[in-house]
């Protein structure tokens, strides 16, 4: 037997209305909560509870309130049918469009762009939202999330941002000067660098950072800072004493402050310590003459004590020396010659005094000398060797080169 659903010929099927069909179906009640609420409700709560993202939470909450106002406006404008099916479909479509619009508004570009454009109106919107935040409660999966922010925590006021940032920032020590970050730095610059980094005193740096340098360098740094402080103290005391008529740079003018002389010595030592070793004195170069060169020079000196430039240049070519060296040699040789002559004159004078020493007793000896009387009654004693001494003096003074002590009074120079 084959069963078919088609009616036999001549008969028609007629469905009688049921009891449920006759009764009017009540309109379906559809919840008007926004679609996909679990995602951004929780995100909004997290952003609002975060201290660093207060503006983003306010922005999201304002978007949700705008959507709620749009839903209420569309509900008042859309007519409902008898069975309520058309209105329910319209509401669902509006909810989907609102969810898509909200998702498009949650992008980073849209949020940051609106922040840059509406930077001036952000505080007023934030205050309005924070005032209405206590009345609006957002529900998600049966859990009520109350969004409450007090006036002290609201980021709309600039004072709260400054206070929160000040509270969140940790207390840090004073910054170390850049020139002290190298342990190999010379200790001479330690006092100035520590004074620039710490306003109280240079020793504050060593107290705050005891392990900044190794042991030996730390001890040297402490000693140098102490010396710098002592120097500043002494300079201040000297400046105070300068008002009483004493000069601060003369230690002899302060009999009650004997440490000022030691201060100058220590200051000189510190200057050498800070700027390295003192500059060395330039050593003068000495020319060592050979025997042949000395013979040529002595022969020329016997002829003349003052050779001209042409003669010095010719002599320099002969002895293979510079003309400046030859000039210096002649200058030194003349000084040596003057010294020898002075010694000879002194020796002859002493010899004459010894020969004439016997006449000082007032007695005259005819064998040792002759006595002559003058018209004024004075006696003149003439020693026998006085003529020879006078002749030697005349020979010394009468130089063939015309030399005199007044011509050149310089000492010996290095050739």
Curated annotation (Swiss-Prot):
Organism: Drosophila melanogaster
A GO term for molecular function: protein homodimerization activity
Region of interest (Disordered), residue spans: 1-37, 66-87, 114-171, 238-284, 336-383
Pfam families documented for this protein: Homeodomain
Keyword DNA-binding: yes
Name of this chain's protein: Homeobox protein goosecoid
Composition skew (Polar residues), residue ranges: 122-143
GO process terms (BP): negative regulation of DNA-templated transcription; regulation of transcription by RNA polymerase II
Chain intervals with Low complexity compositional bias: 23-34, 154-170, 354-378
Domain of life from the UniProt record: Eukaryota
Keyword tags: Developmental protein, DNA-binding, Homeobox, Nucleus
Gene name of this polypeptide: Gsc
Role noted for this protein: Appears to regulate regional development of specific tissues. Can rescue axis polarity in UV-radiated Xenopus embryos.
UniProt DNA-binding region: 282-341
Stated family: Belongs to the paired homeobox family. Bicoid subfamily.
Gene3D superfamilies named in the record: Homeodomain-like
Compartment annotation: Nucleus
Biased composition (Basic and acidic residues): 341-353
